[in-house]
């Protein structure tokens, strides 16, 4: 059995890692909690104090430890070098991240293992009661994160003034979001998976306008349900989703320090006019369906399960010919 150690399940990384955990029938342990010795360990870590302090102790206690990390900018915080230096090989969920790490930290070995996003049918009865006669745009994520540009999505929605349309925001923040905006509905708090599946089923067009994404799990989930998905072309989303509604990005510098982001780092500058264009086109044509078989193939559980098992020499199965190893 593999033990997966990560942050709280309230976080995006926690939810990401837990999907691997469920795929392999492993145990999820939150950083700081105890676990049995001589186990195989899969970490999802960031280069911050609690992780950098804990990893040497975890390695001493365990049979084998592998580590995944993620990034969203052209250059990353120098402390990533400390994290990468603790392992002979680091795992990342995208080629975008792999290239960033290998360019900034020459000699780094990176293996790409894509995110696992299971496709589970939505509940038969709707949870939220979204009006069936409205066209509904939606977004799931930390809506107060500057990287997500959610206020620009709201601005686009208000500027378009589309009759019988709604914008639903599922906020995954640690604080309540209380914005009062006409036609914009905000859902706070941690929801069970069944409710999230219902949200995808009840809404129509997923909108992401991020300056960058290490993966973009909300958009990937929407694609699995064959929703029209608006994404940006900077970062990892195009590695998971092929959509005709892909917004072109220029480049811009970050203007202020925020967590691991530092002023002067570079990420995407998505085209606002394209956001308006794509939202209006989806609405005008009442686009409810977009085939995303390619996304399903990318996040296939059988392949990803085998790739993780190989990391720990479980049954010594060879990596499949489709495995993304670089």
What residues fall within each predicted segment?
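Conserved donor-binding/catalytic core segment of Leloir-type glycosyltransferases
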Residues: 129-148, 154-158, 168
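Short hydrophobic beta-strand element within catalytic cores of glycosyltransferases
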Residues: 228-231, 245-248
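Extended catalytic core of nucleotide-activated donor transferases of GT-like folds
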Residues: 27-102, 194-195
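N-terminal pre-catalytic "stem/leader" segment of glycosyltransferase-like enzymes
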Residues: 1-49, 324-326
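Acidic anion/phosphate-binding donor-loop and adjacent secondary structure
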Residues: 78-79, 116-134
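Aromatic "clamp/platform" in nucleotide-sugar-dependent glycosyltransferases that forms part
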Residues: 211
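A charged, aromatic-enriched C-terminal amphipathic alpha-helix characteristic of glycosyltransferases
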Residues: 266-277, 283-312
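Nucleotide-activated donor-binding/catalytic signature segment of Leloir-type glycosyltransferases, i.e.
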Residues: 175-198, 205
């Amino acid at each position: 059995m593999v033990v997966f150690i990560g942050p709280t399940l309230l976080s995006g990384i926690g939810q990401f890692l837990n999907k691997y955990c469920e795929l392999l029938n492993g145990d999820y342990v939150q950083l700081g909690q105890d676990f049995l010795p001589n186990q195989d360990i899969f970490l999802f870590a960031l280069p911050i104090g609690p992780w950098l302090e804990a990893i040497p102790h975890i390695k001493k206690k365990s049979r084998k430890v592998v580590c995944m990390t993620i990034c969203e900018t052209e250059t990353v915080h120098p402390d990533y070098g400390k994290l990468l230096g603790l392992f002979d090989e680091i795992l990342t969920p995208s080629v975008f991240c792999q290239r960033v790490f290998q360019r900034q930290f020459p000699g780094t070995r990176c293996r790409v293992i894509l995110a696992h996003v299971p496709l589970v049918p939505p509940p038969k009865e709707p949870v939220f009661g979204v009006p069936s006669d409205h066209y509904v745009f939606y977004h799931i994520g930390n809506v107060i994160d500057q990287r997500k540009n959610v206020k620009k999505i709201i601005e686009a929605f208000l500027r378009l003034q589309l009759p019988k349309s709604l914008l639903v925001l599922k906020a995954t923040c640690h604080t309540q979001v209380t914005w009062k905006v006409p036609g914009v509905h905000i859902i706070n708090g941690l929801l069970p998976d069944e409710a999230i599946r219902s949200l995808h089923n009840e809404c129509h067009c997923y909108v992401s306008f991020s300056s960058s994404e290490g993966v973009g799990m909300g958009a990937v989930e929407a694609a699995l349900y064959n929703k029209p998905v608006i994404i940006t072309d900077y970062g990892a989303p195009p590695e998971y989703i092929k959509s005709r509604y892909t917004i072109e990005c220029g480049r811009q510098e970050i203007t202020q320090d925020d967590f691991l982001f530092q002023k002067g780092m570079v990420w995407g500058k998505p085209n606002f006019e394209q956001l308006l264009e794509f939202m209006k086109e989806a609405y005008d044509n009442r686009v409810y369906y977009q085939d995303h078989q390619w996304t399903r193939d990318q996040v296939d559980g059988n392949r990803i399960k085998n790739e993780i098992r190989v990391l720990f020499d479980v049954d010594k199965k060879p990596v499949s010919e489709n495995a993304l190893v670089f």
